[in-house]
């Protein structure tokens, strides 16, 4: 089996595939408040195209798949997509990133279809702040979804928290203490300038350095732990707590040297790097395996060693222009 390596000898065995650009929220770090019309239905990958894409990737050594959006649970066929992907020979792990609003209704069917893991976006515990960040969301639906999913015993549930200055950076300890009685991995993620102006990003960016200081001030004894997989999160557990917390810092501490992932947009383009404008249309190649393989390899051959979110060493400010797609159009 030919496996997927880039020019820096990084093995790529993980695909993140967006199955829709549509979302029922407009989170401030993902979409603009207005505009950004959704793709017409025929521009979005069909269920059969998604399954064929992943089948091709499995023949190239990919064994891990994450389904993203937009909001993937908006697709009425999402359970069938999960089931069919999980049935592909070579695919060992299937997960979904969701805002959780429909999770209470769909978690059981997803588990029965073979879904292994869940990442749920929850940027705050405060209802009004949640409504502000998401531009209208109801946090109680998310909390119900988390409770439902927890009772079903997925392999792992992770909560994604994008830190935004002045909005949720005062809740760090609340999230860490949530792991005392909840078997989840809370992940703090640095706000990235994707689809945002650099000036706006500069005002809202929060580095993760303060997490350890807050833990020490609160008298929390924490230690590093290893979680399954080779993702970008540095993980820790407070002594005596059930769950854990992780730090994902794409800005202040790059993890590019171990990158093993490829992204497929909802309209069928491959992005070898989240913050890299180059894209290759692989949708038109999916039923010609040799052409597909060549297209994927071409994307890998052009993959940069590091992303373009390069920091100036003096003032920690990005000095590169952001990618042209918004996050909802790439796949979170």
UniProtKB/Swiss-Prot annotation:
Binding site for [4Fe-4S] cluster 1: 23, 27, 30
Keyword hit for Nucleus: no
Domain Radical SAM core as annotated: residue spans: 7-221
Binding site for S-adenosyl-L-methionine: 29, 70, 121, 192
Reaction(s) catalysed (UniProt annotation): GTP + AH2 + S-adenosyl-L-methionine = (8S)-3',8-cyclo-7,8-dihydroguanosine 5'-triphosphate + 5'-deoxyadenosine + L-methionine + A + H(+)
Pfam families associated with the record: Fer4_12, Mob_synth_C, Radical_SAM
Any one GO molecular-function label of the UniProt entry: cyclic pyranopterin monophosphate synthase activity
GO biological process entries: Mo-molybdopterin cofactor biosynthetic process
CDD domains: Radical_SAM (cd01335), Twitch_MoaA (cd21117)
Positions of [4Fe-4S] cluster 2 binding: 256, 259, 273
Keywords: 4Fe-4S, GTP-binding, Iron, Iron-sulfur, Lyase, Metal-binding, Molybdenum cofactor biosynthesis, Nucleotide-binding, S-adenosyl-L-methionine
Coiled coil: none
The record's free-text note on cofactor binding: Binds 2 [4Fe-4S] clusters. Binds 1 [4Fe-4S] cluster coordinated with 3 cysteines and an exchangeable S-adenosyl-L-methionine and 1 [4Fe-4S] cluster coordinated with 3 cysteines and the GTP-derived substrate.
Cofactors, names only: [4Fe-4S] cluster
Pathway(s) per entry: Cofactor biosynthesis; molybdopterin biosynthesis
Entries under SUPFAM superfamilies matching the protein: Radical SAM enzymes
Key word Nucleotide-binding present: yes
EC number, UniProt record: 4.1.99.22
Binding site for GTP: 16, 66, 97, 158, 261-263
Its biological purpose: Catalyzes the cyclization of GTP to (8S)-3',8-cyclo-7,8-dihydroguanosine 5'-triphosphate.
HAMAP family: MoaA_B
Quaternary structure and interacting proteins, as annotated: Monomer and homodimer.
Family: Belongs to the radical SAM superfamily. MoaA family.
Full protein name: GTP 3',8-cyclase
Organism name: Limosilactobacillus fermentum (strain NBRC 3956 / LMG 18251)
Gene name as annotated: moaA
